[in-house]
């Protein structure tokens, strides 16, 4: 169960983003302009995919046909990038903490049967059930989250859902800001050591990064193709304990003969 202060923070994030979505969802998703037309708004999502996805398909696909890949977008907002992802990948899922953003995103992808949108609680992916992903993406989302705990919770969740060897590509705030835990617009900032340590704690290899010290600090977190040493040791000792437990049972059974 989440701590009371974290629960309150998540509730505030949801309220604030619902309010922003009702006021002007497209502006708060992409602040380049306030009066987006449908065409312009979704074209801006296509540009994001061209810049951050299509130029990086070797890392993202690793030889797999993108039309056979299942991908997740964290913080899908009103569906700006989600629609563009659906042009590239076979199955696309999106999650967002705001119910109002989710409503608008569902309307935006209503004509795309291979896309599904869910409202989550802002810290985990339980709403998705047992689905595993070939690629996970998040852009201009974590820069708004005021809690390292929430961001790290998401990263651990992605590790749990991402197939071995696969990529979680995402952006965080790398600039120096005086953010407040109550501020759901200017989120927590990360340095290079912060992100390297976070990758290790969450079971990832941070293979590349770009934009450290800026608002657009991009990170390439790869899940290991092999179980970590810690996982291997746990399994080793579990198997040893199981062996001794069953050997004891067999020994007692033989004594009763």
Task: Show which residues each predicted segment covers.
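Class I (Rossmann-like) S-adenosyl-L-methionine-dependent methyltransferase catalytic domain
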Residues: 2-89, 93-126, 148-150, 167-257
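Short catalytic micro-motifs in class I SAM-dependent methyltransferases
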Residues: 140-141
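Catalytic P-loop NTPase motifs of RecA-like helicase/translocase cores
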Residues: 145
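A conserved beta-strand element that flanks and buttresses the S-adenosyl-L-methionine
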Residues: 137
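A short glycine-rich, Lys/Arg-flanked "PGG" loop and its adjoining helix->strand segment in the class I
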Residues: 152-164
């Amino acid at each position: 169960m989440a701590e009371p202060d974290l629960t309150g923070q998540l509730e505030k994030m949801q309220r604030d983003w619902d309010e922003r979505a009702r006021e002007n969802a497209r502006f708060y998703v992409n602040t380049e302009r306030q009066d987006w037309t449908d065409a312009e708004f979704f074209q801006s999502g296509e540009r994001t995919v061209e810049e951050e996805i299509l130029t990086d398909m070797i890392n993202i696909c690793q030889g797999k046909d993108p039309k056979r890949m299942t991908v997740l977008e964290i913080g899908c907002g009103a569906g700006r990038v989600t629609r563009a992802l659906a042009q590239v990948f076979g199955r696309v899922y999106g999650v967002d903490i705001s119910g109002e953003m989710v409503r608008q995103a569902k309307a935006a992808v209503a004509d795309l049967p291979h896309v599904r949108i869910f409202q989550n609680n802002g810290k985990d992916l339980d709403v998705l059930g047992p689905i595993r992903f070939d690629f996970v993406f998040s852009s201009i989302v974590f820069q708004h989250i005021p809690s390292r705990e929430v961001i790290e919770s998401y990263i651990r969740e992605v590790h749990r859902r991402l197939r071995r060897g696969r990529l979680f590509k995402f952006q965080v705030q790398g600039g120096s800001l005086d953010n407040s835990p109550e501020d759901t617009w200017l989120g927590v900032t990360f340095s290079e050591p912060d992100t390297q340590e976070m990758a290790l704690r969450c079971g990832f290899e941070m293979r590349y990064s770009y934009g450290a010290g800026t608002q657009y600090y991009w990170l390439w977190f790869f899940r290991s193709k092999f179980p970590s040493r810690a996982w291997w040791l746990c399994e080793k000792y579990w198997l040893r304990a199981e062996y001794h437990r069953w050997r004891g049972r067999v020994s007692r059974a033989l004594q009763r003969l």
